[in-house]
Amino acid sequence: MPIIGPWRKLKEKGLALDAKFDIRMPDTWTVIFDLSNTEKVKNSLKRADEEITELKASLSEKKKGKEMDFTVPEFVGRVLKKIYDGKMRKTKNLSVSDACIGCTLCAKKCPFQAIEMQNKKPVWVKEDCTMCLGCLHRCPTHAIYYGNGKATNAHGQYTYQKYAGEKSV
């Protein structure tokens, strides 16, 4: 399997990667993935906690090896990245409904600073963003959606704090 991503950069610099690990977490990209079943999400987080415990032990023991379950051929990764970067990361895919209460959580928490509040509503001021959907997941009234909203509205919201029993921010 060809080396992709940051591992290729290490190899180009003459550095070796001794180990890599995979921790499966709930995928929060609700354009595709469904997080509406809270029990499934809780089970996924429980498995992740177990994997983290195993990972800590492996790191303590300085184990070497490839512990990742998921890899894709390089050409598939390039095609998916081109689609994602070319169309899916465009902020024009994000919209806000009249349910917006102007709380500003979306703008305050956007890691890309792609959102500004105008007339108490979010406006995406950058053409692209990381499309983390943090704005969508934090909106207390579910007013932010991707595309036509059918998938993201039906697939639920996720913040780790919600499942960790902490205040969601």
Name the predicted role of every residue range.
Residues D34-E39, R138-C139, K167:
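Short alpha-helix boundary/capping motifs
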Residues S36-K40, M88, K92, K121:
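Short amphipathic alpha-helical segments at helix-loop
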Residues T71-T104, K108-P111:
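A mid-sequence, solvent-exposed acidic-amphipathic segment
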Residues V96, L105-W124, G134-A151:
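Iron-sulfur cluster-binding cysteine motifs and their immediate structural context
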